[in-house]
C-alpha cells in the first residue's frame, strides 16, 4: 500500500473504523453487565463514544493493515455465576456485533444499489457532484462491510488475547483448560510468528476468508459476479478512486 496516495480514502474510512471498534468493545461491556459484572458500566465503557475505546496503535493498524483493536474492556469474572460459560458469551458478543453491523451495511448498500440500477436503466444516473456523493456513500457502506467482517474474523482466532480464545476455552475439558492456560503466552507468540511467516510468503488466510465472505454476501443479495449492479458498484468505486488519485 502506498500510504500517502491512499491517505484520502483512509481518512474517509475513519468514522467507519471508529464505529466498528466502539460497537465491538461496547458489546463486550454490555454482555458482561447483563451477566452481572458492572465494571464496564461503572467505567463508562458501554458507549459508542470512540474516545472511551481508543487505542492509537490498534486504530492505525486497522487503517493500514486492516487488522486492529481497541482498548480492551475490563472484565471481572468474580461476578459471573459460571465463569467459563460467561467469558465465552462476553467474548462472542464483540464479533457478533461486528457481523450485525456488516449485515446492516450490506442491506443499506443493497438498497442504494437498487436505486442506482433503476436510475441507470432510466438514464437518470446523476453526474458531477451528485455522482461523487453517491460514490462516497457506496464506498463508506462497502468499508463498513469489509472492516466489520475483518474485525469479526480477526477476533474469532482461538488464541489469546483474541475473543475466540474465550469461546474455545469454554468447550475444553477441565483437565485441558488449565494446561492450555499455562502455555497461552507461548501459543500466542507461536501463532504471531506463523501469521507473519505466512504474510512474508505472500499468503493471507484472513484476507482469503474475508473475500470469500464478502463475495458470498454479495451473491446472497443478488450482487454476485456478472450482475449489472455489481458492475455499477465497481464503476462508482472507480469514479471515487479516480477523483482521489487525480487530486
Which role fits each region the language model picked out?
Residues 1-247:
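Hydrophobic transmembrane alpha-helices and their immediate loop junctions
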Amino acid at each position: 500500500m502506498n500510504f500517502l496516495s491512499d491517505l484520502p480514502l483512509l481518512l474517509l474510512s475513519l468514522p467507519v473504523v471508529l464505529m466498528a471498534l466502539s460497537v465491538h468493545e461496547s458489546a463486550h461491556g454490555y454482555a458482561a453487565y447483563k451477566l452481572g459484572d458492572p465494571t464496564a458500566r461503572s467505567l463508562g465503557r458501554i458507549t459508542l463514544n470512540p474516545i472511551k475505546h481508543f487505542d492509537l496503535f490498534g486504530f492505525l493498524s486497522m487503517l493500514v493493515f486492516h487488522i486492529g483493536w481497541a482498548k480492551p474492556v475490563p472484565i471481572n469474572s468474580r461476578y459471573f455465576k459460571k465463569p467459563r460459560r460467561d467469558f465465552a458469551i462476553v467474548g462472542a458478543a464483540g464479533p457478533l456485533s461486528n457481523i450485525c453491523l456488516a449485515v446492516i451495511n450490506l442491506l443499506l448498500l443493497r438498497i442504494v444499489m437498487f436505486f442506482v440500477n433503476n436510475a441507470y436503466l432510466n438514464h437518470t444516473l446523476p453526474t458531477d457532484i451528485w455522482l461523487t456523493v453517491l460514490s462516497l456513500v457506496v464506498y463508506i457502506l462497502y468499508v463498513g462491510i469489509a472492516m466489520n467482517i475483518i474485525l469479526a474474523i480477526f477476533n474469532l482466532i482461538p488464541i489469546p488475547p483474541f475473543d475466540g480464545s474465550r469461546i474455545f476455552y469454554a468447550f475444553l475439558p477441565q483437565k485441558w483448560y488449565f494446561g492450555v492456560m499455562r502455555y497461552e503466552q507461548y501459543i500466542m507468540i507461536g501463532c504471531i510468528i506463523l501469521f507473519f511467516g505466512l504474510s512474508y510468503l505472500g499468503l493471507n488466510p484472513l484476507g482469503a476468508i474475508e473475500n470469500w465472505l464478502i463475495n458470498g454476501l454479495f451473491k446472497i443479495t443478488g450482487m454476485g459476479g456478472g450482475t449489472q449492479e455489481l458492475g455499477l458498484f465497481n464503476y462508482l468505486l472507480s469514479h471515487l478512486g479516480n477523483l482521489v488519485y487525480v487530486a
